[in-house]
């Protein structure tokens, strides 16, 4: 985010850089974003290929992302930990992606996709919350 003025103090979770003209930029450095989500989408692609269905990745992403909009706001209770690698913003040295749910959660494709989309921007939100306070 290009800043109108310098931050009031230094934040461990925010990297400061500048634009070519020297304007200050605050950047949340996330190690994990869509890598885990992309892995799941590639799994759906592989399934389509096994069925002999032509794969257009733009269509696969579009259909799955739009379908996520029909899921529950709370993702039906499903939880995704998308850490392929460590994440300094949240204090994790190593990554171990996981998808978890309880027997009573609303396990649907829409909720599955929604929770992975939320997870892909979760760390970015933590950093942005610092900037917008």
Whereabouts are the PLM-identified features?
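Active-site core segments that coordinate phosphate-bearing ligands/cofactors
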Residues: 1-133
């Amino acid at each position: 985010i290009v800043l109108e003025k310098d931050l009031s103090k230094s934040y461990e979770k925010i990297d400061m850089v500048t634009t070519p003209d020297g304007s200050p930029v605050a950047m949340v450095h996330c190690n994990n974003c869509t890598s885990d989500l992309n892995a799941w989408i590639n799994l759906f692609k592989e399934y389509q290929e096994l069925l002999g269905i032509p794969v257009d990745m733009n269509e696969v992403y579009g259909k799955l992302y739009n379908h996520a909009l029909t899921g529950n706001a709370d993702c039906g209770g499903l939880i995704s930990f998308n850490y392929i690698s460590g994440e300094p913003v949240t204090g994790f040295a190593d990554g171990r992606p996981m998808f978890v749910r309880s027997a009573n959660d609303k396990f649907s494709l829409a909720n599955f996709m929604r929770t992975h989309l939320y997870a892909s921007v979760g760390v970015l939100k933590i950093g942005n919350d610092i900037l917008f306070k």
